[in-house]
Amino acid sequence: MKLFSGKATKTALIAAALAVTPTVAFAAGENLASDDFVGISFWLISMALVASTAFFFIETQRVEGKWKTSLTVSGLVTLVAAVHYFYMRDVWISTGETPTVYRYIDWLITVPLLMIEFYLILRAIANVSSGIFWRLTIGTLIMLVGGYAGEAGYMNVWLGFVIGMVGWFYILYEIFAGEAGKLSAEQAPESVKSAFSTMRWIVTIGWAIYPLGYFFGYMTASASMESLNVIYNLADVLNKIAFGVIIWSVAVSESEKA
């Protein structure tokens, strides 16, 4: 028996996304200074993520059933990120310190979900082995655990950097030359192939911002924490919102063909 209609599901998803916003938006009760450009970037990106969440959840009702999961995951990515960004903003305003713990908690949830998107869009058009899912997940966790351990001081920053890079390169191999990349090239229709390719380049070029920030911020100390946070924030816009827009575009395109 179907418990919820499509309209009811859409309403519930949007309500859940918006309900958390007032609670976390005023968590610290601090005023935002007009010259605090890092704090301003946290706020702008927080609201952009909330708006993206509402958009992705609404659009799930526009696409075919096989694409709904992908679009819902895109909305979950931006929702989780929005909540964490409000708290990261509070940490920055209250202490002036980099919110490393909140940022990595966000990444530990959202980055694996982004990687799962590769698996989901391939599953929508072909029979896909679960090996793709697990390889992308494992590569993501290796990358993030290495990065966090290095930034938080649990291991040597160089060792953390190397471990993180190994995880990233493992992901790149899978989506370019591994089973996922081959499946996209051989079985995907042109619209899916194009989306998959764009997503790959976001993971290649967009994600390169993070190890560069790590290198200049923690290994050489040549970048200020203010610059590092702004760079990370802008990178998250590209790597979360743009990623979801690509999924939305191919989902709508393929649904309209059906």
Where are these regions (language model features)?
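Residues at the start of alpha-helices and the adjacent loop-to-helix junctions
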Residues: F4-A8, A19, Y104, V203, ...
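N-terminal secretory/membrane targeting signals
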Residues: M1-A27
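Polytopic alpha-helical membrane-helix bundles and their juxtamembrane interface segments
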Residues: F26-R103, I116-A258
